Amino acid sequence: MVDLESEVPPLPPRYRFRDLLLGDQGWQNDDRVQVEFYMNENTFKERLKLFFIKNQRSSLRIRLFNFSLKLLSCLLYIIRVLLEKPSQGNDWSHIFWVNRSLPLWGLQVSVALISLFETILLGYLSYKGNIWEQILRVPFILEIINAVPFIISIFWPTLRNLFVPVFLNCWLAKHALENMINDLHRAIQRTQSAMFNQVLILISTLLCLIFTCICGIQHLERIGKKLNLFDSLYFCIVTFSTVGFGDVTPETWSSKLFVVAMICVALVVLPIQFEQLAYLWMERQKSGGNYSRHRAQTEKHVVLCVSSLKIDLLMDFLNEFYAHPRLQDYYVVILCPTEMDVQVRRVLQIPMWSQRVIYLQGSALKDQDLLRAKMDNAEACFILSSRCEVDRTSSDHQTILRAWAVKDFAPNCPLYVQILKPENKFHIKFADHVVCEEEFKYAMLALNCICPATSTLITLLVHTSRGQCVCLCCREGQQSPEQWQKTYGRCSGNEVYHIVLEESTFFAEYEGKSFTYASFHAHKKFGVCLVGVRREDNKNILLNPGPRYIMNASDICFYINITKEENSAFKNQDQQRKSNVSRSFYHGPSRLPVHSIIASMGTVAIDLQDTSCRAASGPTLALPSEGGKELRRPSIAPVLEVADTSSIQTCDLLSDQSEDETTPDEETSSNLEYAKGYPPYSPYIGSSPTFCHLLQEKVPFCCLRLDKSCQHNYYEDAKAYGFKNKLIIVAAETAGNGLYNFIVPLRAYYRPKKELNPIVLLLDNPPDMHFLDAICWFPMVYYMVGSIDNLDDLLRCGVTFAANMVVVDKESTMSAEEDYMADAKTIVNVQTLFRLFSSLSIITELTHPANMRFMQFRAKDCYSLALSKLEKKERERGSNLAFMFRLPFAAGRVFSISMLDTLLYQSFVKDYMISITRLLLGLDTIPGSGFLCSMKITEDDLWIRTYARLYQKLCSSTGDVPIGIYRTESQKLTTSESQISISVEEWEDTKDVKDPGHHRSIHRNSTSSDQSDHPLLRRKSMQWARRLSRKGPKHSGKTAEKITQQRLNLYRRSERQELAELVKNRMKHLGLSTVGYDEMNDHQSTLSYILINPSPDTRLELNDVVYLIRPDPLSYLPNSEPSRKNSICNAAVQDSREETQL
């Protein structure tokens, strides 16, 4: 490089001085060469080609001019025929010579000259080296036939009356029309419609055939009948319609031959055109055609993008979307890359859906298909992932690309996206609303373990039910004879609504008052449950911000009610008093119907005597002293307008008192073990930070393995750890990132440390290191590699003393060849667990909600059969929640993530639903926002009596807001139902039993909800006993008595005892203690259900679990020293405040 630089000589001084004055322009201009590009387009031929062919607009004008010219020539031919006088005689000269006036001849010559010149010019411009290709084209030959004779007649005047078949120009006009339509579509930038073109070609072909036949017959009959144009038209229409009256017929052989030729041409050309049209029509039916621009601009529509459309997904979307009155005029455009299956096609042919649903086959990644769906004019776009795929990550990737494509094509279109894996969520943060399936699923299953039936509670809240229907017969469960089904169905109609406080009749009077005061009095007066609020200048929703929050006029209130306030009617005070008097004669558990409370503005008749003049009786719900009890009912402190937080407790009123009795040594050890803070490691990007109970130091990975000893501990089974609380076992296929959201809600900072349950992850596959890094900071979290198929694995992980077992649906089994068979393995495994461990609370996730009828299946249980019939009736009535009366769902024992699809659909109308659901599930934590928890009603709490008094007690003491009740009752069957449960064959088997008491016991046990509860034989034993009973008449009396005795001995050995013995033997074989196995404890003869926002006078019952939204403990600090328990809670809150720096 140095040598090259040394070879360059220095510039002379004069050049240096010139460069200083003029810059570098002087010598650069000397060497610069101007280059012109695209010189090939500057030739005369290329300029003509650009004007006549390439340029869209000029080419369209040329095509239009050519089309008009051909129509003009046909019009001149008709004028010539009409002006011509009929010739005399039948000489053949009339075929070759016609009478043509001079002006008409001049016009036809001019048209011929222009047409021929244009044809030759276009042929020259499109010439590509083969001259015969241009000459032998049919349009060029027709042009020569129709134009050259007129040009020759200019120089040879005797040929001016020569007949020229100018009517053949109609075919040239047809050809020009096709080219013009193509150029028109290019000019207006519109996607060409093959169906439109084909229909146009068919119509123009038919018209050309008829016009050619009319003119040809009329001319050939000049030597015959002398037909005019109208007679020729009549003859052609009659002939082509196959009617053939015969009143007008051709006479000459030439005209007859021409008619035969035209019929042959029609029989060849028209079927081809119809076949192509039919093919395109079928393809159009498959692809769905287009959604017109005019409709998109004048009507409202949303687009649903899916990779494959199943009938269940379609009906869930349509039922939920059109459940809102203001969406009745919307259209749904479905954009799916696959062909419509038979079931979907059948549904979309129903008039109710065919008028509002349009199916387009196409891909969201193609702008052409997005244009067909008019995505840029859509009100919203719903993009759903296909969960029934083996590779769910690949399904998410497709969803991400669809979302990007829609955002690129229509940036102003609101996006509602469903994603499966939480690690993929950050790719679509730009979407307006996102629902991550695994996040919601695991958080909901986790809360099910500490707040029973949370999954059912959330599912009912996000579904649009018919509980608010005016017609009683249309409401869920109102036709059932069971009272619990009526109450449960009516309360299921409660949903979350919003309204501005100053515009509300419910809440306007509470401006300037505390949130808890407004919540209690709104429920007392109107029966609505105020659960959250949002400032006008803030996007964050606060669930139960507590008694320190003062309501403003501009606040947006979120409340639970049967219907929104705008659809409610209010009675005056006199009407309410009359209704209260008439209603006071009934003293049932639910005295006032919900709808009557909603429609009233008066105060509900709640017995709160002496509550306005008495102070709080104590910090808990405990019953006051006996002396006070003898004089009057226990009093409840009133809810203050502006709360005095010195009397507000931040701890659970009904929490375990053992936490108060903790010794100083236990407190010291507890403080050393646990800390409060944010998890230092998150397994995926985009997880919401949650304040949790954490360990001071992370646990070594070897200590996370439950069934393997290491150098730090020597425990090899759950029993050896000596946990004080019962286990929560999660059976999953893999330790995905979503499983992290199962642990976080159970280790949230507001959960008491004494109530933390150990978590055991029973995994089919070993977890990876990233997942272990995330969970090693949480206390009492372990994993074990095993399967629920293996009894030994279940026993090692501590299933015998577990509080809950969560069975997560496996990804590898989510897809099956036959619909609804994806849950087969899960259902059978859970049924085995149900048989082996009847006292275990099992929470199962299924792929298809329809399969929940197989959970805890009892084929001969008449109560389950009655519920099956009720479900069918509700489905026939059009209910969106036909499965809600199934006992496993009502009790919160089964859940399907597809039930939460409606959460995304509801967000189109209620854009706050996703945020509220995430706050309830603990997926998001906002400072000042409360959390979902529960409390159990014990015998000491029954003095409160009603739900309204409980509402007041909670609001006045702790600031908690109750939102519902989880109630458990024993199953009671009527005599008729009991009789149904015994089949004829069983009755024949038991009719020989002489002991009436034993017969009654068998009869009573047969009505139980669990067929395995009473002493029945296994299947083979029953078959053997029946065979003996059928052979009975063949034996003597002594033999019959012997057979009867053998059958009684078999009955005494129950299936439950055999299973219990099997489990105990396996436990002994594994070296496990059998003390924790309670083989006879059974809670399966009960039914549980949820009452969302029950009426204020609903009676509390023993073992009711009340759902609470508790204020954030970190939002305030009490100023006084109430009780010892309260001070402990305040200290915990103070520690939390110091750690979080909030």
Curated annotation (Swiss-Prot):
GO CC term (a single one): plasma membrane
Superkingdom, taxonomy of origin: Eukaryota
Domain RCK N-terminal residue range list: 299-435, 725-865
Name of one Pfam family that matches: Ion_trans_2
Residues exposed to the Cytoplasmic side: 1-63, 123-137, 174-198, 278-1142
Organ and tissue specificity: Detected in brain, and at low levels in heart. Detected in brainstem, including auditory neurons such as the medial nucleus of the trapezoid body. Detected in the olfactory bulb, red nucleus, facial nucleus, pontine nucleus, oculomotor nucleus, substantia nigra, deep cerebellar nuclei, vestibular nucleus, and the thalamus. Detected in hippocampal CA1, CA2, and CA3 regions, the dentate gyrus, supraoptic nucleus, hypothalamus, dorsal root ganglion, and cortical layers II, III, and V. Detected in striatum cholinergic interneurons.
InterPro entries given in the database record: K_chnl_BK_asu, K_chnl_dom, K_chnl_Slo-like, NAD(P)-bd_dom_sf, RCK_N
GO biological process terms held by the UniProt record: potassium ion export across plasma membrane; potassium ion transmembrane transport; potassium ion transport
Effect of Y279E: Greatly increases unitary conductance of the channel
GO molecular function terms attached to this record: ATP binding; chloride-activated potassium channel activity; intracellular sodium-activated potassium channel activity; outward rectifier potassium channel activity; potassium channel activity
Biased composition range(s): Basic residues: 1017-1037
Catalytic activity, reaction form: K(+)(in) = K(+)(out)
Regulation: Are normally in a closed state unless activated by an increase in intracellular Na(+) and Cl(-). Inhibited upon stimulation of G-protein coupled receptors, such as CHRM1 and GRM1. There is conflicting data about the effect of ATP on KNCT2 channels activity. Intracellular ATP was initially report to inhibit the channel activity. However, others studies conclude that KNCT2 channels are not inhibited by intracellular ATP.
Subunit annotation: Homotetramer. Forms heteromer with KCNT1; heteromeric channels differ from those of homomeric channels in their unitary conductance, kinetic behavior, subcellular localization, and response to activation of protein kinase C.
Domain notes: The consensus ATP binding site (1032-GPKHSGKT-1039) seems to be non-functional.
Purpose of the protein: Sodium-activated and chloride-activated potassium channel. Produces rapidly activating outward rectifier K(+) currents. Contributes to regulate neuronal excitability.
Annotated protein name in UniProt: Potassium channel subfamily T member 2
Organism: Rattus norvegicus
